[in-house]
Regions:
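A short beta-loop-alpha structural element at the N-terminal edge
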Residues: 1-9
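Helix-loop element at the rim of GNAT/NAT acetyltransferase active sites that forms part
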Residues: 9-24
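Acetyl-CoA-dependent GNAT
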Residues: 24-71
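Short glycine-aromatic motifs
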Residues: 40-41, 113-115
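Long, contiguous binding/interaction regions
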Residues: 56-59, 85, 97, 108
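Conserved acetyl-CoA-binding loop-helix of GNAT-fold acetyltransferases
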Residues: 74-88, 103-111
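Conserved GNAT acetyl-CoA-binding A-motif
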Residues: 89-101
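Conserved catalytic-core motifs of GNAT/GCN5-like acyltransferases
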Residues: 97-98, 115-126
């Protein structure tokens, strides 16, 4: 399985109601195009031993995101990956753009020193 397939499998585990970037699950072709065209500052697969367990990324706006396979959440892997990622990257500021109903992510980022700074609203015009 290549990284795009792995990322798609992770995406399918996410809850649509708490995911800020997807309101519905894209199909495989949409996902593949997304992976190909989005050039993040950094986008890494998280490995434990020889197994892929999640991904972590940093956008051009210094927004950080992380997702760990649901079967492996709450074992400390995400926190370790986040701390290593930030240390390796060396930025002075990171943003975590989190859906306000995603309490797990709010708690996770708060535990790692992130503080709430704003609420963002959007309006879509058709």
């Amino acid at each position: 399985m290549d990284d795009a397939e792995f990322l798609f499998d992770l995406l399918k585990q996410r809850e649509g109601t708490v995911n800020i970037s997807h309101k519905s699950l894209p199909d495989w072709e949409e996902h593949l195009q997304y992976v190909k065209k989005h050039d993040y500052q950094l986008w890494d697969i998280i490995w434990v031993e020889n197994t892929r367990i999640g991904n972590i990324y940093l956008t051009k706006n210094d927004e950080i995101g992380i997702f760990i396979d649901k079967k492996l959440q709450f074992h400390g892997y995400g926190g370790k990956a986040l701390e290593e990622f930030m240390k390796k990257n060396g930025k002075k500021r990171y943003l975590a753009n989190i859906n306000p109903t995603n309490y797990k992510s709010i708690q996770f980022f708060g535990k790692h020193g992130f503080t709430h700074i704003q609420n963002t609203y959007h309006k879509k015009i058709n």
